[in-house]
């Protein structure tokens, strides 16, 4: 099969890296050849695959060597669980330079060194936060990733980020082949969460490709720097990631999304009872200004 390049986006702290690493571990279990490219200065996109605190990054090693041209592929590419190939782009020191530049440098380096020509089935880009700048949007902008998956939850800001990312996809979809593959709901146990994300996906013209329930086994595995697939392969949560992997392998629904307005998003939250219409009357009011509090 032809190599598929996928990027995982989502609100910061939503669980992108954990979801991505468990997903690729499940893909490896299916016999797929996979590479993860971490596009985050924290360099935590591969730690569960490599059982390490953080992988040495391309930007760090380039700084030590002099320039990125002084590096060889074997210097930066490591192999972990399930023969998954791992690369971290890295970034500058906090407060110095553009972290998005590290993503651009890393992807260009991997292409120049023919890293993608090793009979790979999948490349996954695990990307920092929202589409915050041109550097982090590179997998979309430069047509590196054809499939975008957004990790979200039933929380308003996670849904807001998913909608924003969809806007970024639309911006570049007409000039390239980038498409939205679906929303991955990484549950936060909010009310009617699966229904809400399915409704959001429908408004975006896409799908909720899988609902990943919340389970403490994920944290237990992370403490050991392992995926659930490796740590406890018999766990129900491991089967959830296996199901997600199979759905992505079989996914044919790749669309140019139809983002919605903030008003439409709030209306959706009201429809599902997450936000009450009356709440709009208390926006900007302090506790002292609210009658309910004044009477206490």
Swiss-Prot record:
CDD domains: NifH (cd02040). The modification ADP-ribosylarginine is found at residue 101. [4Fe-4S] cluster binds at residues 98, 133. It comes from the Bacteria. Its EC number is 1.18.6.1. The keyword Coiled coil does not apply. Binds 1 [4Fe-4S] cluster per dimer. The keyword 4Fe-4S applies. ATP binds at residues 10-17. Its cofactor is [4Fe-4S] cluster. InterPro entries: NifH/chlL_CS, NifH/frxC, Nitrogenase_Fe_NifH, P-loop_NTPase. It is an enzyme of class 1 (oxidoreductase). It catalyses: N2 + 8 reduced [2Fe-2S]-[ferredoxin] + 16 ATP + 16 H2O = H2 + 8 oxidized [2Fe-2S]-[ferredoxin] + 2 NH4(+) + 16 ADP + 16 phosphate + 6 H(+). Keywords: 4Fe-4S, ADP-ribosylation, ATP-binding, Iron, Iron-sulfur, Metal-binding, Nitrogen fixation, Nucleotide-binding, Oxidoreductase. The reversible ADP-ribosylation of Arg-101 inactivates the nitrogenase reductase and regulates nitrogenase activity. GO terms for biological process: nitrogen fixation. Pfam families: Fer4_NifH (PF00142). One of its GO terms (molecular function) is ATP binding. PROSITE patterns: NIFH_FRXC_1, NIFH_FRXC_2, NIFH_FRXC_3. Homodimer. The key enzymatic reactions in nitrogen fixation are catalyzed by the nitrogenase complex, which has 2 components: the iron protein and the molybdenum-iron protein. Belongs to the NifH/BchL/ChlL family. This is Nitrogenase iron protein. The lineage of its organism: Bacteria, Pseudomonadati, Pseudomonadota, Betaproteobacteria, Burkholderiales. The gene is nifH.
